[in-house]
Curated annotation (Swiss-Prot):
The keyword Transcription applies. PROSITE patterns: FORK_HEAD_1 (PS00657), FORK_HEAD_2 (PS00658), FORK_HEAD_3 (PS50039). Residues 258-341 are annotated as: Disordered. This is Forkhead box protein A1-A. Keywords: DNA-binding, Nucleus, Transcription, Transcription regulation. GO terms for cellular component: nucleus. Residues 287-304 have a biased composition (Low complexity). Residues 159-253 bind DNA. SUPFAM superfamilies: Winged helix' DNA-binding domain. GO terms for molecular function: DNA binding; DNA-binding transcription factor activity; DNA-binding transcription factor activity, RNA polymerase II-specific; protein domain specific binding; RNA polymerase II cis-regulatory region sequence-specific DNA binding. Probable transcription factor. GO terms for biological process: anatomical structure morphogenesis; cell differentiation; regulation of DNA-templated transcription; regulation of transcription by RNA polymerase II.
Length: 429
């Protein structure tokens, strides 16, 4: 902001030296009346703001622009007393060509203004620059009516901030009998919250699910004195106060009925102690059917299985037979291994107290003897190959199998392996 240039000239000739145009000079205005009022002149478009009317008594500011867009004059009360109705006509710069003129006046001298000075806008303390006078707003227009605009809208049909469990609890607790039917719960929710008057099928399904899958709600049958359709729903007596201080926005804890949990535990216990064969029969139900069909389709394997169920003395000559019994024995062993998990599904009655998935319950005694017999046969083949009696690719029915006489006879007996793999070792319970 440049400094204020003081004007020393008080005569008309002095003013005409500064402005070549005679129309812009104050020729007819007596300068003696404005000696105290005109103290300074600013040659820019801006206007020094006047804080209060008391600042205009001693010295004012005379603002003038070369574009003749606005003219402001600070006048003292003594200078304003001499201004009459012809004051506006005497000032040539304030004609019709000037868009507007802002004059800061003291409140006591406002009554001296004539009707011709209506174009002079009385500016407030926060008024705009007179250079922008064509776009100047009044004090009432500057304060935009923002209070009428509501930024926070009210939604009367907005979704309430309550869960379905909270809505059901509120409906039941506000009922006189502390129990309501499903239709009464629906009606209470729709009467209280307009949001639920639409899309009824969606939230009504959620209400039914909340009633069914929460232990805090108990279904009560209708009494004979209250005929009608549908059962009553009430709160569980042990549920207590699920909502803190009556605030239904959030539950304190999820209620779980201990009786229901105990009943489920007893049922699980009964399932565990119902018998060792029940889980296996439930898992391998289709396997037993496949085993029965395979036994019917292969009748030749069933007599061999019956022979293995016999005594040990009957099994010894069967192992020590010729090459053709050995080949048939191997075929039967392969067939039994293919259906190893399907043959004996029933548990051993002598060890029914064991764990249902123990080895003794999965395998019977005859199956154990059959597996031990097959292990003895495998060991005999390994010993025979270690002695170099024949090639590994030799068929079992070849004459080279005649060297099996060197095998220890006790290794072929099932009692030999029963001493190694006894029942207590196989028991995993």
């Amino acid at each position: 902001m440049l400094g204020i240039v003081k004007m020393e000239g008080h005569e008309t000739t002095d003013w005409s030296n500064y402005y070549q145009d005679t129309q812009e000079a104050y020729s007819s205005v007596p300068v003696s009346n404005m000696t105290q009022g005109l103290a300074s002149m600013n040659t820019y478009m801006t206007m020094n703001p006047m804080s209060s009317s008391s600042n205009m008594t001693a010295a004012g500011s005379f603002n003038m622009s070369y574009g003749n867009s606005g003219l402001g004059a600070g006048l003292s009360p003594s200078g304003m007393s001499g201004m009459g109705a012809g004051a506006a006509s005497a000032m040539n710069g304030m004609g019709s060509g000037v868009p507007s003129m802002g004059t800061a006046l003291s409140p006591s001298n406002m009554n001296a203004m004539s009707a011709q000075q209506a174009s002079m806008n009385s500016l407030s303390y926060s008024s705009m620059n007179p250079g922008m006078s064509p776009m100047a707003y009044g004090s009432s227009n500057m304060n935009r009516a923002r209070d009428t605009k509501t930024f926070r809208r009210s939604y009367p049909h907005a979704k309430p901030p309550y869960s379905y469990i909270s809505l059901i609890t509120m409906a039941i607790q506000q009922a006189p009998s502390k129990m309501l039917t499903l239709s009464e719960i629906y009606q209470w929710i729709m009467d209280l919250f307009p949001y639920y008057r639409q899309n009824q099928q969606r939230w009504q399904n959620s209400i039914r699910h909340s009633l069914s899958f929460n232990d805090c709600f108990v279904k009560v049958a209708r009494s004979p004195d209250k005929p009608g359709k549908g059962s009553y729903w009430t709160l569980h007596p042990d549920s207590g106060n699920m909502f803190e201080n009556g605030c239904y926005l959030r539950r304190q804890k999820r209620f779980k009925c201990e009786k229901t949990q105990g009943g489920k535990g007893n049922q699980d216990g009964r399932k565990d102690h119902s018998g060792p064969s029940s889980p296996l029969q439930r898992v391998h139900g289709k396997s037993s059917q496949m085993d029965s069909s395979s036994s019917m389709s292969n009748p030749s394997s069933s007599p061999q299985a019956l022979e293995h169920n016999g005594s040990n003395g009957e099994m010894k000559p069967q192992v020590a037979a010729g090459p053709s019994p050995l080949s048939s024995h191997q075929n039967h062993s392969t067939h039994s291994l293919a259906h190893e998990s399907h043959i004996h599904l029933k548990g051993d009655p002598h060890y029914s107290f064991n764990h249902p998935f123990s080895i003794n319950n999965l395998m019977s005694s005859s199956e154990q003897q059959h597996k031990l017999d097959f292990k003895a046969y495998e060991q005999a083949l390994q010993q025979y190959s270690s002695y170099g009696g024949g090639l590994p690719g030799m068929p079992l029915g070849s004459p080279s199998m005649s060297g099996r006489g060197n095998i220890e006879p006790s290794a072929l007996e099932p009692t030999y392996y029963q001493g190694v793999y006894s029942r207590p070792v196989l028991n995993t319970s």
